[in-house]
């Protein structure tokens, strides 16, 4: 099952997200407190810029997700978990690490996007659960579903557009944007 590229991607998304979930739950409170600290957010953007800069200058590898080891997958999950802090890009950290592991740029981008989907869905469910448990919600279910649908469609469009552009350009522009 885990010998094909798709099987390896499934394992990456499953096993790689275990440390992410643990770090996300453990550091949630601290991350929420740091979100109001402009210096902490700025440091997060600086970290993102450095990772993108490194990813942009490293020679592209030839490996595929099939070549990832268990340790590399767990390290990807830990890196992704560090993105709970404000300003730190989950995508940039995972992308840079995959490129450092010798993955092709195309497979690195695909893995980085796919790896964050379960985390984002889990965070969404976690947040909605908190929202409803507080009883302070004044939005109808229909309005919320429409917002979710619109957000999902917009996200798919933006991800697709970003993936097309990122194949053609370097990460330098976004790295500079993060610094500014």
At which residue positions do the language-model features occur?
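Multi-pass membrane proteins that catalyze or facilitate reactions on polyprenyl-/lipid-phosphate substrates
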Residues: 1-180
